[in-house]
């Protein structure tokens, strides 16, 4: 959807650029700046704005956390789009078996479906994060709607787990000038990620595992998915099958696992 909007905005800006050029020339304003230069100017602005919206680590809209300290052999596992049963419970089983703590960025709508799972996440020492209510494309929304979806998700998550989330991750990592500021106003620190392995493409458990292991580095925040937006019970078995091997290989390479908050704070992983 967002790519259609990008195309529409770009075509609109080209039309506006041509109109501005004609008006400017008609009134004798900046006569040397012809239609082509107006178009180029608007397109350059489009590129800058789109880069800021779609590049999760771009500082254009402010700084955002996307990795922990590089001087410590610690990493964080994060899971987006849950809870999604029975798969989130299977993720929790694997983490419990390996004695690893992780961070779950939850969708409010999914949290309403499976409140008991959120309680288990908290009881087993994992961290809760806010991933909005409905996984909408936030750059297409205004400040009021952004605040509403973040606050509503935090309310649902707190009711289910007894803990209000203190971290926020925008769906797809896409932001606009208001997203990070509003998230902080709502008590959530925005967090992106260091390593995404496109596990939602279902490339196979071996590929998912190898991509994670190959991309590991100190302070790495790993993005995986225990759900798929608001899809009803999407099958994420490939990711779950890869998870024990990911944890084992990371430990063999000397990495320890921490929740995102502990990783960013530089405190000892549990």
Give the role of each language-model region.
Residues 1-77, 84-97, 114, 119, ...:
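N-terminal pre-catalytic segment of deacetylase/amide-hydrolase enzymes
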Residues 51-141, 145-152, 156, 161, ...:
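Active-site beta->alpha N-cap acidic-glycine motif
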Residues 79-81, 106-108, 130-132, 170-172, ...:
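A cross-domain feature marking catalytic cores of carbohydrate-active enzymes
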Residues 80, 95, 104, 128, ...:
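Divalent metal-coordination and catalytic microenvironments
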Residues 134-136, 197, 228-231:
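A short, flexible beta-alpha/helix-coil linker loop
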Residues 140-144, 202-204, 233-237:
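Short, solvent-exposed loop/turn segments at secondary-structure boundaries
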Residues 174, 180-216, 255-266:
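His/Asp/Glu-enriched short active-site or ligand-binding loop at hydrolase and phosphoryl-transfer sites
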Residues 213-264:
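Catalytic grooves of carbohydrate-active enzymes
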């Amino acid at each position: 959807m967002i790519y259609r909007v990008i195309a529409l905005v770009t075509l609109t800006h080209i039309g506006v650029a041509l109109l501005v050029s004609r008006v400017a020339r008609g009134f004798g304003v900046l006569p040397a700046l012809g239609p082509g230069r107006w178009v180029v100017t608007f397109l350059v602005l489009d590129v800058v704005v789109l880069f800021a919206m779609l590049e999760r680590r771009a500082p254009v809209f402010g700084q955002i956390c996307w990795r922990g300290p590089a001087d410590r052999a610690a990493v964080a596992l994060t899971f987006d789009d849950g809870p999604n049963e029975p798969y989130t419970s299977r993720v929790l089983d694997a983490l419990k078996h390996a004695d690893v703590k992780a961070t779950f960025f939850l969708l409010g709508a999914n949290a309403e479906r499976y409140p008991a799972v959120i309680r288990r996440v908290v009881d087993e020492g994992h961290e809760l994060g806010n991933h909005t209510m409905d996984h909408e494309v936030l750059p297409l929304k205004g400040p009021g709607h952004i605040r509403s979806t973040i606050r509503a998700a935090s309310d649902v998550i707190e009711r289910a787990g007894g803990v209000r989330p203190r971290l926020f991750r925008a769906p797809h990592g896409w932001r606009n000038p208001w997203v990070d500021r509003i998230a902080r106003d709502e008590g959530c620190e925005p967090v992106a990620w260091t390593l995404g392995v496109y596990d939602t493409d279902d490339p196979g458990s071996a590929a998912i595992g190898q991509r994670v292991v190959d991309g590991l580095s100190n302070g790495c925040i790993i993005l995986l998915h225990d759900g798929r937006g608001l899809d009803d019970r999407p099958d994420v078995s490939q990711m779950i099958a890869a998870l024990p091997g990911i944890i084992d290989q990371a430990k063999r390479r000397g990495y320890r696992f921490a929740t995102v908050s502990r990783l960013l704070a530089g405190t000892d992983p549990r």
